[in-house]
Amino acid sequence: MTVDKVKLVIDSDGVSDDVRAISLALQHPKAEILAFTAVHGCVTVDQACANIKRTIRANDRSNIPVYKGAAKSILSLPKDDTVSDFFGIDGIGDKPEEFPKVERSDFEGEGKHASLALIDILRENRDATLVTIGPLTNVAIALQLCEEFSTYPSRLVIMGGNYYAVGNVDGGSSAEYNFHGDPEAASIVLRRMKCPITIVPWEAFYFESKTHDASVDFSAHLKYGTPLANYLSLATSIGRVKCEANGRQYSYCDEIAVATAIDEDKIAKKSQYLYVDVELNGTKTRGQVVVDWTEQLWSNEEAPNQHTHRRVKFVTSYDVHTVDKWLHAATSGSGKFD
């Protein structure tokens, strides 16, 4: 039976939940990966590039280009550097000698900056979905370089942001990590992209975490003994130990955004359209998504029935069991994604 493919370009900072999400995309029969782009985030952009290329090999794939992008945020400001406690120094378990062994060439991207690659690839593939699972710097730079880029993706799926001010950044911030990593980039993207945008926010995981912890074994898919299962077990090992020490599991996050990009109708159980912006000035709220709940905050004085900001779709509940089934299919090699 012929499967209708969903073309994807995935922009990532390449840490443990990213590589599990990337593996899901590489294994899913409905996903066609055009390229990966690496961005700074929980690790350096060089390390992100290396982790993505290593993950491609772990999935027994080749010939998928990886482009290296922004090494710093738009303003090059300091950010939370405590995430190595959760992901490891290299972001995926700190065992570079394990399969697949890190190669020196892993730290080298294709001969083009990621933002330029995004412009070129999506200009030629207007039916492709752009998925971002790291800070939005590469996408913002693409918009700064090419205004028409705002219309190139068929849609943009973002893992990041929040809508009830629930943050996950150390230091008392009310921002989500990816948006906190480059608030200016997040603001540029939400204001200027013209294609449909779907955001999978931090609260989607936070509010349902206890229910999901009780119904899903988030480590079971890592125990098949296959090369991919072993690699992802290694990549998530530090985070799983940290979570277990706090009485919880290392559940899915970036994986939900990639799954949503592959089949939004199947994964997104509930969603809400909201007028939003990103706070750029607050000492505790910088990077937080601000929601116009009354739909009056950014009303257009010259056209009262119009809005100066656009509505963005937020996934507020998702089918974790389908994502878990897909990851079992990926790591076991069963191919049973249906």
UniProtKB/Swiss-Prot annotation:
InterPro entries assigned: Inosine/uridine_hydrolase_dom, IUN_hydrolase, Ribo_hydro-like
Phenotype when changing residue 42 to A: Reduces hydrolysis of inosine, adenosine, and guanosine by a factor of about 14-, 22-, and 10-fold, respectively
Active site, UniProt feature: 13
Keyword Disulfide bond found: no
GO BP, one annotated term: purine nucleoside catabolic process
EC number annotated for this UniProt entry: 3.2.2.-, 3.2.2.1, 3.2.2.2, 3.2.2.3
Catalytic reactions of this protein: a purine D-ribonucleoside + H2O = a purine nucleobase + D-ribose; guanosine + H2O = D-ribose + guanine; xanthosine + H2O = D-ribose + xanthine; adenosine + H2O = D-ribose + adenine
Signal peptide: none
UniProt remark on cofactor binding: Binds 1 Ca(2+) ion per monomer.
Molecular function via GO: adenosine nucleosidase activity; calcium ion binding; inosine nucleosidase activity; purine nucleosidase activity
Pfam families referenced in this protein's UniProt entry, alphabetically: IU_nuc_hydro
UniProt binding sites for Ca(2+): 13, 18, 133, 254
Subunit structure: Homotetramer.
Similarity annotation: Belongs to the IUNH family.
Role this protein plays: Catalyzes the hydrolysis of the N-glycosidic bond of commonly occurring purine and pyrimidine nucleosides into ribose and the base, with decreasing activity, in the order: adenosine, guanosine, inosine, xanthosine, cytidine, uridine.
Name of the protein described by the UniProt record: Nucleoside hydrolase
